Amino acid sequence: IHLEMMGLATFNEKNIYYRDYIKSAIQMWLDAGVDALRVDTLKHMPIWFWQEFTTAMKAHKPGLFMFGEYGFSKPWEQRSVDYANNIGMSILDFGLCDGIRFCFSGQEPGGFHQVERVLNYDSVYQRANELVTFIDNHDMPRFLSIVPDSRKLDLALVLLTTLRGVPCLFYGTEQYLNNATNGGQDPYNRPMMESWDTSSHSFKLVQTLLDLRHRNQALSLGSHHTAWINDDFYLYTRNFRDSAVMVMVNKSEHDHIVDAENIQMPDGSYTCLITGFPVNISNGRLQGYRVHGNSAMVISAEGNPVEAPLVVVFQINGFETQPGQSIAIIGDCDELGHWDHAKAYRMEYVNQNTWTATVGFNRSCLLYTSPSPRDGDES
């Protein structure tokens, strides 16, 4: 035992016997069938320790998903960003959690601009789409304790499931579970489950949108494009390859009339997955469309995912492009153009720091590289 923190014993990570012990102990859980790890208090151990730990875990169980808690991290705080980018696992996105909670509680002004502020920092991360997002957890009052309105909770859940990141839902949130005693502070934020209602509006909403995440890669891999925003109304799209999702959220008590252009959705007639209302996009525009107060709308254009014996997700970070430029992959196989730049596989823009591509292969061994655009070149 090395130190004491918050009433808990901590250990000396410099001791190789401890490091070997903790790695072997967690590997036993993986062998028992555990398929993901949530790690506590990342920031109290050095980056090199987590690099060693995550390397050992992923070597033991390839494909393991890991994320950890860097308590109350913010994308404008460099130390937490360094952890997110260098420890080999994702982290909980406290910044976006705060943005969503401030948006609906009014604890800080700005409404949806609080959310947009956080998203504008996405390029500081190497894997923003892998940040684990949430709106409440065991270390803070539940959402309903600070915003006692189930309609607002439903709107927050729409954001949680359609914005970038991997959504993490606190138990009971889908049942409107809450105990506001003492402002919902610990231990009142951890009540026993009172309901298992699979017909509640919140349960069905979450079920619908999580099903959409499985079907539409724009939500798991795509870029974010804001088409309209003010304090009370938010219209954005998520886009990846030929897939797209459009989301409209109105947290005002009053209806909002939408007049928006440059919406990155294919033109066509859609049906909202939440309300069942029709939505028509023409020339990238939505004009004179009424969105009721305290409601959200989600429409989806589901493209064709890449299918092949082997599907590889490529990602490039750290290369900033200019408008009109793109990044592509070339390699020694048919799928990557046999080193011919004219036949290279073009990647998808996610943010200033991230380009992604899903490529299907008919074989499992290949050589590849990622060419950079030249000045004045369009590809």
For each feature predicted by the language model, list its residue ranges.
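A short, amphipathic beta-strand motif
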Residues: 312-318
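Active-site-proximal helices and loops of the catalytic beta/alpha 8
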Residues: 24-27, 35-127, 131, 148-150, ...
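Aromatic-rich carbohydrate-binding modules that target alpha-glucans
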Residues: 319-364, 374, 379
